[in-house]
């Protein structure tokens, strides 16, 4: 058998996923969830349709949050925020009805994460909504900037952190 690695939280850079497969021979899976949605909302794991792809192409596919877990519905609203509903989502924040009302609207939990849904119905997480950088009218996620920098072969580690600006 192969060693399997499951990563939850922000996906590692595509290059790291590729190296896990090619250099270590491990099988990579990506999970997405929040404390409020315990244990998870989506899962992305190797599947037969990825087999013909190159290691780099497979890594790019596996770096997304994947498809909804059993019994979970996800969508992205007009503002680009990821919403979810299922029976695993919290009923509310303890003794915080106002915060609960902000987080759960019309039965949909607002994750606070920005993202999109790809043509193959996988969820792509862009960034935490509050970490998006607005430059020249364009929304740029810190994850995208990290990925671009990390793709350079001389870069071993990188972290991009958005800092609020008056502009």
Put a short name on every predicted segment.
Residues 9-10, 33, 66, 86, ...:
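Active-site glycine-centered loops adjacent to acidic/histidine catalytic or metal-binding residues
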Residues 11, 42, 52-95, 102-106, ...:
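Adenylate-forming AMP-binding core of the ANL superfamily, especially NRPS adenylation
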Residues 76, 86, 91-92, 99, ...:
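AMP-binding/adenylate-forming catalytic core of the ANL superfamily
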Residues 1-60, 73-79:
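Gly/Ser/Thr-rich phosphate-binding loop
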Residues 18, 63, 98, 147:
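Active-site phosphate/pyrophosphate- and oxyanion-stabilizing loops and adjacent acidic/basic residues
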